[in-house]
Amino acid sequence: MRHRKQGRKFGRTSSHRKAMFKNMSASLINHELIKTTLPKAKELRTIVEPLVTLAKREHKLRQELDTNSNEFKAQSVALRRQAFDFLRNKAAVTKLFEEFGARYAERAGGYTRILKCGYRFGDKAPMAFIELVDRPQVEEAADEE
């Protein structure tokens, strides 16, 4: 029986699953929008949201403490190391702490949005976009003819 068992297996070994979600998390942080299967998007949400909360905690510390104090530096480094321990991607950790901490400072959770987008052509797997809310919109250049 699977009573009280959390998470999905996706037909993969635990190491494969862990590597897959590390890569997907880094991609979501870097691009702020990715397309994947619906179950993977739902599972990814449970991984990315705590990482954004770490960035929010560092942003709050930045406002409360002097950025040159040893207490701030120690706590900031500890939070960044926690994020890097999972992501293993310096660019993603930098973007997470420098952009997302300030962007989501006033939001109390719910940093991601899942939008269903039909079914995959080959196997009819339900597909979805997962995006970070309040992301800057890139405007397409309109063709003037």
From Swiss-Prot:
PROSITE patterns: RIBOSOMAL_L17. The gene is rplQ. Gene3D superfamilies: Ribosomal protein L17. Part of the 50S ribosomal subunit. Contacts protein L32. This is Large ribosomal subunit protein bL17. GO terms for biological process: translation. InterPro entries: Ribosomal_bL17, Ribosomal_bL17_CS, Ribosomal_bL17_sf. Keywords: Ribonucleoprotein, Ribosomal protein. It holds the Pfam family Ribosomal_L17. It comes from Francisella tularensis subsp. holarctica (strain LVS).
